[in-house]
């Protein structure tokens, strides 16, 4: 009996190690071709410039879903659970990613103009300049604070609701055509964890500085960097889930 238990545990251990390796290789496979093939990277930049919303859908759909799979691995020991729903999550993340791109455009354009309205000279010019200056840093920080204070809580709550809706529909694509019972989903949120950890801690301690760096990058690189942060988001959500329990 003891031997059987040991064998089963060993098989599970090596199975998880194998899936961890495959997950890491999948991440490398996504980015390595762009590093090895300059022509492919140039095509990506051109397509991204011409079809920014399409690329936002793809970047967030792939990378943020992988981030949630990593979070699932941390919280449950597996990358996918029966109700996880990879395909519906990818589609929902793609739509959310387009919303994030829209928010980044709105706040990166509007916040510097508001700062000039409030008396800061040349905020728009400083933010648009290629060279790094302290003024550019302050504007980038202001953009990040504005976006994450106004937009992020609504986005995070909607994301929480869509996750619960997908799980309630067994992780199937049916979730995409089934109306969301918003009041029920909203009431079911663990607000102790949502406010006490997700809003109160991750926004000021992680997202403010992370998106400050994002807004210091050239405009064409911001959405990709934000999508990469989706992997970090998956880890943070996993920690939030553990705290909620």
Model-found features: residue ranges?
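Hydrophobic/aromatic-rich structural module bridging two neighboring secondary-structure elements via a short loop
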Residues: 75-108
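Alpha-helical membrane-spanning segments of integral membrane proteins, especially the hydrophobic core
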Residues: 86-98, 126-151
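N-terminal membrane topogenic signal
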Residues: 11-27
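Hydrophobic, membrane-inserted alpha-helices
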Residues: 206-214
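Alpha-helical transmembrane segments of multi-pass membrane proteins
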Residues: 24-42
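Loop-to-helix transition at the N-terminal end of transmembrane alpha-helices
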Residues: 46-65
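Membrane-interface interhelical connector segments
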Residues: 111-138, 169-181
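Transmembrane alpha-helix/helix-exit interface in multi-pass inner-membrane proteins
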Residues: 97-118, 141-173
């Amino acid at each position: 009996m003891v031997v059987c238990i040991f064998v089963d545990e060993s098989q599970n251990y090596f199975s998880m190690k194998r899936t961890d390796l495959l997950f890491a290789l999948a991440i490398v496979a996504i980015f390595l071709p762009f590093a090895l093939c300059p022509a492919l990277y140039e095509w990506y930049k051109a397509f991204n410039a011409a079809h920014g919303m399409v690329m936002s859908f793809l970047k967030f759909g792939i990378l943020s879903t992988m981030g949630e799979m990593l979070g699932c691995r941390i919280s449950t020991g597996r990358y996918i659970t029966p109700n996880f729903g990879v395909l519906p999550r990818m589609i929902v993340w793609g739509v959310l990613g387009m919303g994030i791109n829209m928010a980044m455009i709105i706040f990166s354009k509007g916040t510097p103009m508001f700062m000039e309205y409030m008396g800061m000279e040349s905020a728009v010019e400083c933010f648009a300049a290629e060279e790094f200056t302290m003024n550019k840093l302050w504007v980038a920080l202001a953009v990040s604070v504005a976006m994450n204070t106004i937009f992020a809580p609504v986005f995070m709550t909607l994301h929480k609701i869509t996750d619960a809706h997908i799980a309630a529909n067994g992780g199937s694509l049916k979730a995409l055509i089934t109306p969301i019972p918003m009041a029920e989903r909203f009431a079911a949120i663990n607000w102790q964890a949502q406010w006490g950890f997700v809003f109160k801690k991750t926004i000021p301690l992680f997202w403010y500085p992370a998106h400050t760096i994002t807004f210091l990058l050239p405009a064409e690189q911001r959405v990709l960097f934000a999508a990469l942060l989706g992997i970090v988001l998956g880890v943070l959500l996993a920690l939030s889930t553990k705290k909620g329990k």
